[in-house]
C-alpha cells in the first residue's frame, strides 16, 4: 500500500519528464545551493515526502566550490557564480521553475529557474558564470 501511495504522490513529477518543454510552476525558492542549483518548496508532495526539491539548471556547468573545486580559481569562480544566483533570486519578484526531467543524481530535478520571466540559464552564460554543458566531458575551470 505504501508503494502505491508513493507512486501516486510522484505522478505529478513523473509526468513532466515526458514533456520535452517541461512544466512551469510558480515557486518559493528556499535557498541557493550553488550557481546552478536552487531549492524550492514542493508543498504539493504528500507526507512523508520532503516538502523541498532541488532543481539543477539544465544545459549549464558552473564552477564547483568547496571540496569539489579542483583549484583555488575554480573555488573563487564557484563562489562568484553562487553569489550571482543568490543576488538574481533576491532581486526577482516572480520566481518559477521549469521542470524537465529527473537528474542523474537522486533527489534533484533538471530544468530552469525563471526569474521575472528571464532564464537563469541564460543569465549565467551571458554573464560568464557558466558554460553550456549537455553531459560531455567538462572543461576545466582551473586556467
Predicted regions and their residues:
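Small beta-barrel nucleic-acid-binding modules, primarily SNase/OB-fold domains
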Residues: 15-143
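Sec-dependent N-terminal signal peptides
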Residues: 4-13
Amino acid at each position: 500500500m505504501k508503494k502505491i501511495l508513493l507512486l501516486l504522490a510522484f505522478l505529478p513529477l513523473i509526468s513532466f519528464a515526458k514533456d520535452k518543454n517541461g512544466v512551469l510552476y510558480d515557486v518559493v525558492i528556499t535557498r541557493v545551493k550553488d550557481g546552478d542549483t536552487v531549492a524550492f518548496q514542493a508543498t504539493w508532495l504528500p507526507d512523508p515526502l520532503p516538502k523541498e526539491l532541488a532543481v539543477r539548471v539544465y544545459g549549464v556547468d558552473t564552477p564547483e566550490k568547496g571540496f569539489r573545486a579542483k583549484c583555488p580559481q575554480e573555488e573563487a569562480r564557484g563562489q562568484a557564480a553562487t553569489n550571482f544566483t543568490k543576488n538574481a533570486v533576491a532581486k526577482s519578484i516572480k520566481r518559477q521553475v521549469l521542470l524537465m526531467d529527473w537528474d542523474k543524481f537522486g533527489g534533484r530535478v533538471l530544468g530552469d529557474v525563471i526569474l521575472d520571466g528571464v532564464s537563469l540559464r541564460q543569465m549565467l552564460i551571458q554573464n560568464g558564470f557558466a558554460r553550456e554543458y549537455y553531459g560531455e566531458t567538462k572543461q576545466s575551470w582551473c586556467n
